[in-house]
């Protein structure tokens, strides 16, 4: 098995994947540190178990209840043996996850003495380990280096003891896979009394054995999540060294199943169970079905992979292969593409120092950092699942990126938040990309990921091939432009209403009338829905019927007999509207640039059922309140000049955008960035030529298909007045426009900037199906400053055309006269 390392699985890993992991079809999954994947036969085995046995609540004496109790006891023992833990020395407490186990320990330490406890933790700890510091009444300390830990251990016996001390650290960094000295636990125990260790093994146990056979060297508390090992069930464990169990003696709270007697009238008294640690700590009814599923997980895991040693060997081989390929990848000028964050002493061939996780960022040939969010988005389009951000490891990430606390506070003040796309600040990355391998990873995963990096981020020559020549004077004096189509999107992120030919449409400072005046909001979170998460929203098609005064909404495929229709009055009277707060920051895919917006939600059950039933999401329609626009257009800038040193010959080279003065900023309703979005038919045509001429990907069949202009969701599509042929067009010339006039009244529009694109352009607006184009091609041909651009943001000028606001209209066929940036 020379090309697969020393893996000794019972079957070839590719055979296992084909049989057990159909969910991996056409997908490259590289986020096993988040959760690994469950096997098909695990779910089937658990299902057979549930349908063949009657399991009752364990807190009863009935036969079904006793069966549950027996299974829980057996699986608890099996879990201890899985980690080579002697049940005479250790007990295992079932909890929701590793974080719940950490909190249980920290809460118990806080209650163990009147003054509380002292807490120390390693800088490379998971956020949940860091959070325990807030409960430490005596104080806390973050150890920035291993040397600091070593020095502290050596002086433990000389330090004054004010109360119990707890030192926590990860067995393996969830950020970069670096493994920590296991010997600290035993040394701390030997060096001082009343000092305990908490070891976070959640990341480690995903791909490595965790051996507790030597109780004297073991941590006092170990926390883990079983889904990291098996993918399912969602269950965690706290493994307690019994000699440290007295820490829980003064725990105040008790729940059902943890007491032998409780008095509630008169004297308030209770007697805790004393037979085992887990009986005292497992409050209420155990998640016994999840625990029973854990039994199926142990069986399946052993049958598929043999042992954790096998998994460790397999993933170590793959990680080394990936690391070698990433660190040797070069641009045309010899500069490294991948910057891997790895301690110098760790080695991907040594399981005592390194696990199968790679933390990295990408750089251009000139050394500029490439934004993590953009890489993750592009990977997602290619069905490659990776992780980006601070990876729930704030200290390790900050240390790797050399960010100080003052730096991060400044970033927070500038608007940076967890999960947003503030990728680069002060010229440095704010987060990290992570690839993590699992038991069922294979060489194809490595090849696919490296092929993705090479295709999109390795610069093979000093110049990027331009699709158009630089702007020349004669180009600005050739045939003119006209409005090819007008589109209004009454419900944000839903289908377009095409303004009929010959119909003049009113335009205001907020944009085309009725554009993005409504949105769909999640009834639980208040978050606005969007096509990135719910692509079927493209099949919700509004029609503005001015003659009847209604917004007629149709759901379903065109000409489908199952289509349903709902009519919403355009008039706000008698519309069952309730004012509510639309919090855009409650989830990552913020749809209104992070603004918190007050909207009026429709309270009618008929309205909410219409949209909820179609999307399969509990949602309702909401409307932007009248005369209350406090949102202002803020198109994203920073495109760089046409002489940018990073992309000197980029197609449609971007001129420097001029910032809009605060006094002239335009109000918007529920649009993302600006009142109006414009694209060019010639640019769409050129993009499609590029798409059709590019090679297909591994998972594609046949020639790539052109995309419709509708995927860009523009309000205005302009076309050139060709005398013929179409090849005479000027694609991307709109990038040179500073302003334009439209129609017989010469309505003046300012160009605010270029439109930054995301994966939503991959949703086919006719079928609601997501693909990889045009985002893949845009990423190669329309990137500037690590952002992808296509189309231009517009706003109607507030003065200078002599027309009153209410008389401004545009129509399909109107002449468009652009003004160009100066040289």
UniProtKB/Swiss-Prot annotation:
EC number(s) from the headed UniProt entry: 2.8.1.9
Positions where N6-(pyridoxal phosphate)lysine occurs in the chain: 228
Catalytically driven reaction(s): Mo-molybdopterin + L-cysteine + AH2 = thio-Mo-molybdopterin + L-alanine + A + H2O
Tagged with keyword Transferase: yes
Alphabetized UniProt keyword annotations: Molybdenum cofactor biosynthesis, Pyridoxal phosphate, Transferase
Gene Ontology biological process terms in this record: Mo-molybdopterin cofactor biosynthetic process
SUPFAM superfamilies for the chain: MOSC N-terminal domain-like (SSF141673), PLP-dependent transferases (SSF53383)
EC primary class: transferase
Coiled coil residues, start to end: none
Active site: 392
InterPro entries in alphabetical order: Aminotrans_V_dom, MoCF_Sase_C, MoCo_sulfurase, MOCOS_middle, PyrdxlP-dep_Trfase, PyrdxlP-dep_Trfase_major
Entry keyword annotation includes Transferase: yes
Gene Ontology terms, MF aspect: lyase activity; molybdenum cofactor sulfurtransferase activity; molybdenum ion binding; pyridoxal phosphate binding
Protein family (similarity comment): Belongs to the class-V pyridoxal-phosphate-dependent aminotransferase family. MOCOS subfamily.
The protein, known as: Molybdenum cofactor sulfurase
